[in-house]
Amino acid sequence: MISEKAATALATIATVCWCVQLIPQIIYNWKKKDCTGLPPLMMFLWVVSGIPFAIYFCVSKGNVILQVQPHLFMFFCSISFVQSCYYPPISMARSKIVMIVAAIIAADVGMEVGFILWLRPLYEKGVKWPDLIFGISASVLLAVGLLPPYFELAKRKGRVIGINFAFLFIDSLGAWLSIISVILGNMDIMGIILYSIVAGMELGIFASHFIWWCRFRFLAKGNTFDEESGQAQKEEPDEKIEQDISKSDRNVTNYNLDNCSIPDDASSFADDFNIYDSTDGGTLSRAQTLHAVHGVVVRTDPDRYSRLSV
């Protein structure tokens, strides 16, 4: 052990980070009212990982902070999980969300009470391997929960959508501080490996977005980007578009033709549809129908065809 005081201080800071890291994400979701890019599976796995974490620290009789931390972590993860299910693109029914949360709470209470009462006497007798299994399984669930965001990154060429970077930074900071505290403390190799997996996967998310930014945002000047797909689109000023439309309007000519002069286009490019008259804002009557022929909108009156400016 290099420095017990330094290890304890760093572990405490890391624990605090892992208590509050999801608050920025929750606020971010609430403001956007949209969780596109934040996989519900990620939050669900993190909620479930809190159960074995709580059992592990309660059985080993860790300090109060370590026993409270998994429960706070589960609480904030549950809020974010509910948001990811309720907001688009999932938009799950409230009744279904309530049933899922109730099942998680029931499983949490049952497992914690049962395993803590069963394993604590064994731990006091020196049988520690059952408790260690819970600690390892919790860390594995936490790391596996970081896999779904990579599928979201693949959909958008590496761009991070829906994940708040403040949340990601605080969570990564907790992992790195935990690694340093273990190195300065008892040099638990298993702990270093598990914390390193979490830190490495979160670093990969940062790196993915940075690479996307270098490829598309920084190098492709004069382009705009779709928020969902991340596809680059040419940027055109609104004034130029308006000028082009006005020029096009000046070239439009109205024609009064007989019904028999223009044969009906029965191809797949022609279609009848309802629309409001652009001149007076009123709805077209039954005698006035619209017909689209290869992208040209014409208005049919009983005695004439005329092209509309749209």
Swiss-Prot record:
Residues 1-6, 58-61, 118-131, 186-191 are cytoplasmic. Gene3D superfamilies: 1.20.1280.290. GO terms for cellular component: membrane; plasma membrane. It comes from Saccharomyces cerevisiae (strain ATCC 204508 / S288c) (Baker's yeast). Residues 28-36, 83-96, 153-164, 213-310 are extracellular. The modification Phosphoserine is found at S229. Its main location: membrane. The chain crosses the membrane at residues 7-27, 37-57, 62-82, 97-117, 132-152, 165-185, 192-212. The keyword Disulfide bond does not apply. Glycans are attached at N251, N259. It comes from the Eukaryota. It is found in: Cell membrane. Residues 5-69, 138-194 form the PQ-loop domain. This is Uncharacterized membrane protein YDR090C.
